[in-house]
Swiss-Prot record:
The keyword DNA repair applies. Belongs to the UvrC family. This is UvrABC system protein C. The gene is uvrC. One of its GO terms (cellular component) is excinuclease repair complex. It comes from Listeria monocytogenes serotype 4b (strain CLIP80459).
Length: 603
């Protein structure tokens, strides 16, 4: 993916929390990160200066994607799962497999409330995971004060300090009814599932009372408890408090296109997603059902235990496709939120697609139209651009590139070895190339360009126009692209007499001309270098006394390349099996050639 395409994607990043996945040239995910605001965080990688390790990462990024979440906490939890899933090499690799903590009510005769990093199928009640260890412990401390479950891992022989603090019922000494535990467990579950708001309001009242009574230390403690509740109790739509495998579907449609996003929830966590975009031709709901049918035909898409679908989808039809899976159309709660989130990401992806298309249209077709307006000619939908390349007239070549509606048409590129011109004569070279190109266009009835661009000034433009008009009888607009002292596109010359076409340097039409000039220059230089690499060894040795075809082959076999021969001393050349006087002549000839060619590569 080009850097320009990345810049276009950066411009479309949403102002929302989420996770981003950086990819290298092979499409491998090399880094996963999270952001409170995706737009700001992802853009920061491609602007400003970075330390060495970040620079190494940025140098390998050629593409990225992102997943929008409902909160920053959710982004953090998703980031954990994505890193575990993809193991990106630029992410920190922990030595152990610790994850974020859960609050657990144990399944014991005398249950405990504990913090654990291990989630097991032991009939305990788990809540989380929580992204902030300190805050999770603070919430547990609040619960310990409100609900006096036992604290000891094994029952002691006598009551402990917690009993005297009112934080334990002391089952080690007293009988505690199971109904009492059930009552407390139900209240804890309610607290962790939203009932914390009542407790939070009570704490706020206590904090205000403590502040009014000048008990600032106590007020600060209440404040910390309130902050802990707010931090840890934020809803986490992407994590389910069970181990059920689910696929969550959401889709969006616009302008005849559909985007389907599938969230893969495994062991209760979102670990991956699938994004598909395609045109639909029938009813959207029907095409969506077709997609699901095809989706589960793939060997790597094993139907999970449950599938969540949006409203208005024929769940019975889906059930027929995956008969052993439970089909659910959620109506409320976290399950409904997950479907909404899949839809939200599908809508964002589809909007991004069309915005990228619009931006591409603006920089191609739109730029071509405005270029024609600025020049006072019909829209130049087909533009053919020419450039010459040689070194002191040796191996002169020319190249032509074609742009259709502002986009390169590489099948229409052409290369030319100059046949009739000796020495560095750009005007004569341009005449030959224009003659050869458009004589063939006439003969083979090929498409005529709407505009010819010449990489050069008045002399090259006049040479091209003279051949077109006076030799071939063609009336095609010809313009020239001039460069500044830094070899950058600076002006467009057109008209009779030639005038500078007024173009804003930050306009899309000017950028289009830059791309055309850079592309034809690249193409010409590449062709010239290829030609030189094939003929350079032979041509440089031509004319040296004592060096015939046999010794040329001997030198080539010994040194392997022209570069090594150019760097060789007389003694090293002699070691190739040639007489001393011949070695001296070869060294003298190559030294003179190097001096002549140094820093003189030109168009």
């Amino acid at each position: 993916m080009s850097s320009e395409h990345i810049q276009n994607k950066l411009a479309l990043l949403p102002d929302q929390p989420g996770c981003y996945l950086m990819k290298d040239r092979q499409g491998t995910i090399i880094y996963v990160g999270k952001a409170k605001i995706l737009k700001n965080r992802v853009r920061s990688y491609f602007s400003g200066t970075h330390d060495s390790k970040t620079q190494r990462l940025v140098q390998e990024i050629v593409d990225f994607e992102y997943i929008v979440t409902s909160s920053n906490v959710e982004a953090l939890l998703l980031e954990i799962n994505l890193i575990k899933k993809h193991d990106p090499r630029f992410n920190i690799r922990l030595k152990d497999d610790k994850t974020y903590p859960f609050i657990k009510i144990t399944n014991e005769r005398h249950p405990r409330l504990i913090i654990t990093r291990q989630v097991k199928k032991d009939k305990g009640k788990y809540f989380g995971p929580y992204p902030n260890v300190y805050a999770a412990n603070e919430v547990k401390r609040i619960l310990d004060r409100l609900y006096p479950l036992r604290k000891c891992s094994t029952l002691p022989n006598k009551v402990c300090l917690y009993y005297h603090l009112g934080q334990c019922l002391a089952p080690c000494v007293f009988d505690v009814e199971a109904s009492k535990y059930k009552e407390m467990q139900d209240e804890i579950v309610a607290f962790l599932n939203g009932g914390y708001k009542t407790v939070k309001n009570d704490l706020m009242k206590k904090m205000q009372e403590a502040a009014e009574n000048m008990e600032f230390e106590k007020a600060g403690e209440f404040r910390d408890q309130i902050n802990a509740i707010e931090t840890t109790m934020e809803k986490q739509k992407m994590t389910m408090n069970d181990f059920v495998d689910r696929d969550v579907f959401g889709y969006a449609i616009d302008k005849g296109w559909m985007c389907v996003q599938v969230f893969f929830i495994r062991q209760g966590k979102l670990i991956e997603r699938d994004v598909s975009q395609f045109p639909f031709y029938n009813d959207a709901d029907e095409d969506f059902l077709t997609f699901i049918g095809q989706f589960y035909q793939k060997a790597n898409h094993i139907p999970p235990k449950e599938i969540y679908l949006p409203d208005d989808v024929d769940s019975e039809a889906v059930q027929a496709v995956v008969p052993d899976t439970k089909i659910i159309v959620p109506q409320r709660g976290n399950k409904k939120d997950l479907v909404k989130l899949a839809y939200k990401n599908a809508k964002i992806a589809l909007n991004e697609k069309f915005m990228l298309l619009e931006r591409n249209e603006e920089r191609t077709v739109g730029a071509v139209e405005r270029l024609g307006e600025a020049m006072g000619i019909p829209t130049p939908s087909r533009v053919e651009a020419f450039d010459n390349s040689n070194i002191h007239g040796t191996d002169p070549v020319s190249a032509m590139v074609t742009f259709l509606d502002g986009k390169p048409s590489k099948n229409d590129y052409r290369k030319y070895k100059i046949k009739t011109v000796e020495g560095p004569d750009d005007y004569a070279t341009m005449r030959e190339v224009i003659r050869r190109r458009y004589w063939r266009v006439l003969k083979e009835e090929l498409p005529m360009p709407d505009l010819i661009l010449i990489d050069g000034g008045k002399g090259q433009i006049d040479s091209a126009k003279d051949v077109l008009t006076n030799e071939l009888g063609l009336d095609i607009p010809v313009a020239g692209l001039a460069k500044d002292d830094k070899h950058r596109t600076s002006q467009l010359l057109f008209g009779d007499p030639l005038e500078i076409v007024p173009l804003e340097r930050n306009s899309q039409e000017f950028y289009l001309l830059q791309r055309m000039q850079d592309e034809v220059h690249r193409f010409a230089i590449t062709f010239h270098r290829q030609l030189r690499s094939k003929t350079g060894f032979q041509s440089i040795l031509d004319g040296i006394p004592g060096v015939g075809p046999g010794r040329k082959k001997k030198l080539l076999k010994h040194f392997g390349s022209m570069k090594k021969l150019k760097e060789a001393s007389v003694e090293e050349i002699k070691e190739a099996g040639v007489p001393l006087n011949v070695a001296e002549e070869v060294h003298k000839h190559i030294t003179a050639f190097n001096e002549k060619a140094k820093n003189t590569e030109q168009k």
